[in-house]
């Protein structure tokens, strides 16, 4: 008599169930990782504009004259996850795209003329609470306060 080789239906169903459980655990973690990577790209896109606004504010005694395309502030250019960057009177506004679609980040400079220092407030606006929380964690500066919405 020949012996049968292979897997039984029950064994295959158990393997499929294990794979489904591992996928259910791994997929959200992977999606969070991708979201944080996209937010990091957004932060890296904002940094040259932030630095330019700070230098402009030092040179001109405030951020009122620091808009894109003037006084050393570059013209707005997006990236993979940033559809638009605008700088007006020192305030940076970044609009997300792809996995950050619907996210708007505002970075508002707070100029202290007596000390000659600048601090930043940030505001993350989106309808997704998890994306807003991740944005607030990525765009966290030591001197930042969240803007009241």
Predicted features along the sequence, with ranges:
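Periplasmic/extracellular, small/polar-rich flexible segments of pilin-like filament-forming proteins
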Residues: 57-149
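A general marker of short, structured functional hotspots
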Residues: 3, 26-29, 45, 52, ...
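N-terminal single-pass transmembrane signal-anchor helix
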Residues: 1-41, 45
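Conserved hydrophobic/amphipathic alpha-helical signal-anchor segments
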Residues: 24, 32-74
């Amino acid at each position: 008599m020949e012996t049968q080789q292979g897997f039984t239906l029950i064994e295959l169903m158990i393997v499929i169930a294990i794979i489904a459980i591992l996928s259910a655990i791994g997929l959200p973690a992977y999606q969070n990782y991708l979201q944080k990577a996209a937010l990091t790209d957004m932060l890296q896109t904002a940094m040259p504009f932030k630095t330019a606004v700070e230098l402009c504010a030092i040179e001109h005694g405030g951020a009122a004259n620091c808009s894109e395309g003037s006084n050393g502030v570059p013209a707005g250019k997006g990236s993979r996850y940033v559809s638009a960057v605008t700088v007006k009177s020192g305030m940076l506004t970044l609009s997300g795209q792809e996995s950050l679609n619907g996210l708007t980040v505002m970075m508002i400079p707070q100029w202290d003329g007596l000390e000659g220092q600048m601090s930043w407030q940030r505001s993350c606006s989106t309808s997704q609470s998890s994306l807003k929380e991740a944005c607030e964690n990525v765009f966290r500066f030591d001197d930042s306060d969240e803007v009241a919405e």
